[in-house]
Each structure stands twice: as structure tokens, then as C-alpha cells.
């Protein structure tokens, strides 16, 4: 499973959301979770202070990384997905969402999220599997 920063942040804040609950279950059951670098960056940039940054970094470095087979192709795929969304009349709030979606597509893993944009992206990219919560 690929977990978007929106689900991680809800989990870390202790927010009671479907995605945060599903992530807590996945962690407790040691389900395989791959961490794309872009998700790591999005989580770390929200650290409250230097100490929190270091604690988050240490915790997240224990997760297996998602490593794209070809980073340039991943970037191209994300740009193309973003453009396809725009052509369909929907502009994602962040290009990072398309990059994260393409990580899930390449990994052939479902995406856990707390971000409505992924629902719209999945309507355009039918092979994007979202974790049901």
C-alpha cells in the first residue's frame, strides 16, 4: 500500500478519520507500506520544530521506500496525468498528488488518502486503486 501524506498527517495528529483508522490498523498488523520520497517530504515539511522533524524522520526511515524504476518516466507520467485531469475539466490542487498517484500505479499498490483530489484523479485514471475506507 502507498499512503499519501494526508492520511499520515491525520494519523499523526490523532484525528479520527476513516483513513487514519485504516492506517492505524495497517501499522498494527504490519501490512506492507511503501514510502515515496515525495510523501516523506510532505510529512517532514509540516514538523512543528527541529526535534519533531528528527523524530518524524527517524520513524519514517524505518518504512520501506518506494523507488521508481525510472524517475524521469515517473515525472513524465505524473505530468501527463496532471494534463489529462486538466483536459477533463479538473485541475488537481497539487501536482504532487499526480506524482503520488503515479507511484501507486507503478508499485501496483492501492493508495490510502484523506484527499478528495485522489477520487477525481481515479475517475480519470481508472487503473488507480484507492483503499476503501
Spans of model-derived segments:
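Active-site-proximal, substrate-binding regions of enzyme catalytic domains
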Residues: 51-71
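Short, well-structured N-terminal submotif of metal-dependent ribonuclease cores
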Residues: 1-35, 45-58
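Conserved glycosyltransferase catalytic-site signature
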Residues: 5, 37, 96-98
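A generic structural signal for short hydrophobic patches within well-formed alpha-helices
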Residues: 8-9, 40-43, 118
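Acidic, PIN/NYN-like endoribonuclease modules and their adjacent C-terminal/linker elements
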Residues: 101, 105-133
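Hydrophobic helix-cap positions at the C-terminus of alpha-helices
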Residues: 25-27, 81, 85, 121
